[in-house]
Amino acid sequence: MFLGTHSPRLDEKGRLILPAKFRDELGNGLVFTRGQERCIYVFSQREFERVHEQMRDAPISSRQARDYIRVFLSGASDEMPDKQGRVTIPAALRAYAGLDRELAVIGAGSRAEIWGATAWAEYLEEKENAFSDTDDNDIPGIL
């Protein structure tokens, strides 16, 4: 499970050093893809295969499903971290998420997410008030 917030930096080659707590889960390969809110989703190979299986069950007659699958999978890139836990984030995904040197890598349960540090701080500031006001009627089954 991916938990917490980490603040690594991109090096000049577009590489990220994976947070130590995430390396066991991602050390045998990972998949980057476009995330919602202009972040990058990071899945273990196993979890990505599970997500892909769910997508395969979507009706091909659904335009919304086709559109989502195309955007999601066309941006996907499978990568292998090196022995130091570094992994290159493809340039197209760095551009999509507007990444510069300072990052926020957050745990989101079954996946990690990579955000630009400023974008993450802005998102968190915007959403924290709504978070504190959320009750069990707003999100059934979670609280």
UniProtKB/Swiss-Prot annotation:
GO terms for molecular function: DNA-binding transcription factor activity; transcription cis-regulatory region binding. InterPro entries: MraZ (IPR003444), MraZ_C (IPR035644), MraZ_dom (IPR020603), MraZ_N (IPR035642), MraZ_sf (IPR038619), SpoVT-AbrB_dom (IPR007159), SpoVT-AbrB_sf (IPR037914). One of its GO terms (cellular component) is cytoplasm. One of its GO terms (biological process) is negative regulation of DNA-templated transcription initiation. The keyword Transcription regulation applies. Keywords: Cytoplasm, DNA-binding, Repeat, Transcription, Transcription regulation. It holds the Pfam family MraZ. PANTHER family: TRANSCRIPTIONAL REGULATOR MRAZ. Forms oligomers. This is Transcriptional regulator MraZ. It comes from Renibacterium salmoninarum (strain ATCC 33209 / DSM 20767 / JCM 11484 / NBRC 15589 / NCIMB 2235).
